[in-house]
Amino acid sequence: SQAPSAEEGNIIKLDWWQNWENPDPPECEYVIQSWDTAFSTRTTADYSAVTTWGVFTKGLDMPNLILLGAEKGRWDYPTLREKAVKKFKQHEPDSILIEKKASGQSLIQDLRLTGLPIFEYQPDKDKVARAYSITSLFHNRRIFAPFRKDWAMEVIDETRAFPAGMHDDYMDTVTQALIWMRNGGYVVNGADTWLDKREQEIYNREGRSYY
């Protein structure tokens, strides 16, 4: 079991995360990359962060989500842009989600020119309200991560410390991805229209590797 975080935010609890124990990730029907951007290399600056998520049905009626990758750093703009292209090539997401704010605007425009599947995200609530809005997905044991990976534990530690933690860069990418996927119909709290949506919109990603 994990040692308790020095700071526990108690919006998203550690034991709500599900450990993906298989060395290989599941076959995912849909993959999304979620960015929180900041340009600066100063040590006091915010981090840019990215998380990659896959939707999988695991033989169930309802889809689950798995964290497929995560990275953050203090990058200048050219480095950030290079990272975004590299992450796209690594995971081949169906959608790349970038918050529509000053630091995200240049990246949105530049990446669209390269033909990447960019979607702008405009949050309509404050960070704490956004976190509460996705707790049911965690509480219903729908969110998986490979605990043996250091990057996964970094994301998990940051989500469980929120909003008391020192950093929330990963947390922003988590709430952004989960809200967007839920609102887009890829992940729903009840059965709703998931199967109809899946037939229309979700691609077969057989045989693709993620880690």
Identify what each model region corresponds to.
Residues 1-4, 10-16, 99, 146-151, ...:
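Short coil/turn segments at secondary-structure boundaries
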Residues 33-34, 52, 97, 172:
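Structured core elements
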Residues 1-37:
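ATPase catalytic-site recognition across NTP-hydrolyzing enzymes
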Residues 35-48:
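An active-site-proximal beta-strand-loop segment
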Residues 3-7, 49-51, 56-162, 208-211:
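Mg2+-dependent endonuclease catalytic cores in nucleic-acid-processing enzymes, primarily RNase H-like
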Residues 8-9, 178-211:
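Acidic two-metal-ion nuclease catalytic site recognized across multiple nuclease folds
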Residues 155-194:
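P-loop NTPase motor core of the ASCE superfamily
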